Amino acid sequence: MRFAVVLALASVITLSGQEMMPGTARPLLENLPSTTSGFICPMHPNEVKTTPGTCSICGMTLVPGDPMATADYTLTLSTEPRAVKAGQKTTFRIAVRHPLTGEPVTQFGEVHDRLFHFFIVSRDMTQFFHEHPTLDKDGTFTLEHTLPAAGQYMLFSDFMPVGGGPQLIATPLTTAGFDGDIASSWPNLKPDTSLTKIANGVSVELRIEPGKFIAGEEADVPIHFEDEKSGEPVTNLQRYLGAFGHAMMLSEDMTEHVHAHPEQMLEGTTITEGGGPDLVFHALFPKPGNYRIWLQFQRNNVLSTIPFTVRVLRSGETLAKLRLQKEHAAPLR
């Protein structure tokens, strides 16, 4: 799964409704940029081949890219209407430009059945949406979405430009009619006391002991599914966007984020149907603190989204030490 995190809060954001400079859309595998040096897995960038194929780790189709590419691409976002209002349909237009040439990027690798994954998260982390803009003929992506409430949001753009590396770019947005401040929008995350949640008749358990997530260390994130009524293991999860599950993991300050998927290989054979009852995601939490994990899965053609909140400790830190520090902390004056 993805461990590298690309954050570009300095990305250009244009909330003016102006037209973007048009590009020329081209077929994915035609006229590949000269920077393309191989085929890589978007989830495992170290998996590189000289010819098209699939990832030996997760089974994903490899896409043209440069495993040595480190430059962050430039993303420009515009909205129509210019002022984004809660409860009103808004058209988002997204244009991507090459970091070195400034030219419009029009070729993208398909990652989990889509060219672009667009996450909309409210600043207080109570709202979460996973959308997929469509690629227009002029090379820009377009999405229509209605925000449910006024406030501050962070928009995460997850895509794979042909000839580059995986990108995960964050862009802030404040709606019209929001009269609060940053402090009022700040989340107050607390680790879940129960790691079992219910959604659409499915009991979902995050099977991890408290204190097991350590900053800077790779960790398994195991999820177990049971039928809510019968208690029987769920074995009929459906593939949604090419995987049996999706997870967005986001730090409380929104500076660290990972878009992850479970391993899809079992004894060397790609699973095509009948997912469950257990999925294992892999993640590396870059720094300590509270994180929210949004898990998405599909069963009986119904897509469910469940949030979990977990604590990530510093290396050498334990929950007992953390509680002791809080008990002896000097009161604020």
Model regions and ranges:
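Intrinsically disordered, low-complexity terminal tails/loops enriched in metal-binding residues
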Residues: V5-L7, S11-R333
